[in-house]
């Protein structure tokens, strides 16, 4: 079956819940950030904890509190959150229903290994209710990368094969199998396992092949995959692994015909299609599964991030034809499926349904697309803009013909927007944005105003106008 089952519409238009901070006062920057308390606290932490991310090194602010779409740092500055942590807090920070569910579970039962608990049963049945198609097997984990590893084991068990095809610039985690699916930098590249192969995927802004009319030619990519299967593998490919939308790479969207054609490509060759939906699932792209946007279902998928709204809970899900293979791999982990994690996930799913957040994410998407539509014409450094649900990307370039990435501009825009009170995620020359699904439109307008001001100021500084 190649079609996603239609899902019932979420009830009503989204209305902000009353618990959230008064966003009319956000942003508020009484102390130029990073302020003295943030700098002092981060310096102490950095002496002990090594390997902070690039975004922290660029702007070492210390966050002390979050509510809804607002964050407050140790110096009392308040920010609009356009990061959702790292694509995690889909319901905003500290949603009371989720917080209360976790607290109640912590008072009742914190860990029962992999025994069934009432709240675990509720989560498993709820997943079967909301997911499209014929998903019939689930395992619960505590991080995206462990769920990905479980999915790789499942694909091996289901097919008896051990090779995998993945794509340049996808991201799947930092354990050995997950790292082998991607190439992030030279350190990780040295640890890749044999039998893992990466291929280019269609990028409408940077196509490798085009039709005479200038549109991207998806068939050329599929021809390359077919040739690589014959010439570059031993013929033992278990699965094709893909992020439906590339998150780490900068919210890069596939052309509309790619996922359906990749589904057909896998079906014809007896290869499992494994979609890593840790980032894109649970409403982030406006659907329970991002693949639904293209009326396509994977055979195996992973869920995480927004599944627990910040609490570490992830899942591997498998469609009925491959469900028996899940019995061959152990579901036992120290923390996967613990009562607190399951409570967070159940509460998060219920809030998405009750507050109509799938529908609201698509309303936000429509606003963001309208707002950014003229940016490539309006700004010299803006090469491309894209959005699906609450996943946004703005690509900055030095030259619109060569499309040379403009990393320096990306850094400047990131810092300038943060200084104005917008918390978000850098990615070199690509501006990544992932606001919570609960964000009111008027707050989204404020956030986009800040970003546009930062882009315009950066252009002036770099003498690009």
Predicted regions and their residues:
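Conserved N-terminal phosphate-binding loop of PLP-dependent enzymes in the Aspartate aminotransferase
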Residues: 2-465
């Amino acid at each position: 079956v190649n079609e996603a089952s239609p899902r019932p519409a979420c009830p009503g238009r989204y209305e902000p819940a009353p618990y959230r901070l008064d966003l009319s006062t956000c942003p508020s920057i009484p102390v130029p950030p990073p302020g003295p308390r943030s700098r002092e606290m981060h310096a102490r932490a950095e002496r002990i904890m090594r390997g902070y991310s690039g975004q922290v090194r660029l702007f070492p602010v210390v966050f002390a509190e979050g509510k809804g779409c607002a964050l407050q740092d140790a110096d009392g500055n308040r920010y609009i959150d356009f990061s959702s942590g790292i694509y995690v807090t889909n319901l905003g920070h500290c949603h009371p229903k989720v917080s209360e569910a976790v607290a109640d579970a912590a008072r009742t039962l914190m860990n029962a290994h992999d025994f069934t608990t009432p709240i675990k049963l509720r989560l498993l049945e709820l997943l079967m209710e909301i997911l499209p198609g014929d998903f019939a097997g689930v395992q619960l984990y505590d991080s995206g990368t462990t769920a990905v590893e479980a999915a790789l084991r499942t694909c091996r068990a289901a097919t008896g094969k051990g090779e995998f095809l993945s794509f340049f610039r996808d991201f799947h985690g930092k354990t050995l199998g997950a790292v082998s699916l991607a190439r992030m930098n030279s350190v990780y590249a040295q640890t890749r396992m044999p039998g893992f192969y990466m291929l280019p995927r269609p990028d409408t802004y940077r196509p490798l092949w085009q039709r005479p009319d200038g549109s991207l030619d998806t068939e050329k990519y599929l021809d390359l995959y077919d040739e690589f299967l014959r010439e570059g593998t031993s013929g033992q490919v278990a699965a094709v692994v893909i992020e439906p939308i590339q998150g780490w790479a900068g919210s890069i969207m596939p052309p509309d015909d790619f996922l359906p054609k990749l589904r057909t490509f896998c079906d014809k060759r007896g290869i499992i299609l494994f979609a890593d939906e840790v980032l894109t699932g649970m409403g982030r792209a406006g659907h329970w599964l991002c693949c639904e946007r293209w009326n396509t279902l994977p055979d195996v998928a992973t869920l995480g991030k927004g599944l627990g709204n910040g609490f570490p809970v992830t899942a591997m899900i498998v469609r009925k034809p491959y469900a028996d293979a899940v019995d061959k791999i152990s579901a036992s982990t120290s923390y996967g499926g613990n009562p607190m994690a399951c409570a967070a996930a159940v509460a998060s799913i219920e809030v998405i349904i009750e507050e109509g957040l799938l529908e609201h994410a698509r309303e936000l998407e429509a606003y963001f697309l309208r707002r950014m539509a003229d940016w490539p014409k309006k700004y010299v450094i803006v090469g491309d803009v894209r959005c699906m649900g609450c996943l946004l990307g703005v690509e900055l370039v030095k030259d619109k013909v060569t499309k040379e990435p403009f990393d320096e501009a990306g850094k400047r825009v990131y810092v300038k927007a943060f200084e104005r009170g917008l918390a978000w995620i850098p990615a070199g020359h690509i501006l990544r944005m992932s606001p919570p699904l609960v964000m009111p439109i008027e707050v989204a307008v404020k956030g986009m105003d800040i970003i546009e001001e930062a882009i315009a100021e950066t252009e002036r500084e770099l003498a690009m106008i």
